[in-house]
Amino acid sequence: MLTSNKISSLVIDTLRKQTGEQNIAVIFLYCDYQAQKDQSAVNMIGSLVRQATLREPTILSEIKRAFDKSKREGGDGLQLPDMVKLFGKVSSYMEVVYLCVDAVDEMLPQHRLEFLRALQQILQDAPNVRLFLTGRPYIRAELDKYLTEKTYAMHIIADQGDITRYLRQKMDDNDDQDPGLMTEDLKNNIMATMAEKASEM
């Protein structure tokens, strides 16, 4: 069964293989509901800047100057508009930049909206940036609001048969390690509950 992060990982791996040594960057973020407080828009865009800079180290001095200037002016660091501009500068050194963002729905709503606005600005300012984003269907209206131009949405829904086979395999593996731990009724109950929950996602 492919989960959101496995789909993103496949996309990232495929892009990396296809781009090889070309002047193309593949950079990514995995959002996690357990780290929501750390996933502010400025931190997320900052992570993209960091990853892009690793691909294009010649711009390091310019980024350092921007950080130093921000500190001298009494700031705590670069703000979101500054990070967005920096990302645009870094990405201009590359032919194409692929941004892969997994599980954007797991960000806190206020951070997610700021992040989507920042991505919107990046896509407007940097025509060489391509975005691959995953999230649950309930954020579709937000995506439509901020990322409407030139977007293609694909709904991937878990197949009940795949879920059943995956769960059965995991429970059989568990039986091999600890036989008799689960009764057949418990297994069937787990499978029914998980299949129902998956269909609600």
Residue ranges and their predicted role:
Residues 1-201:
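Conserved NB-ARC/NACHT P-loop NTPase core of NLR-like innate immune receptors
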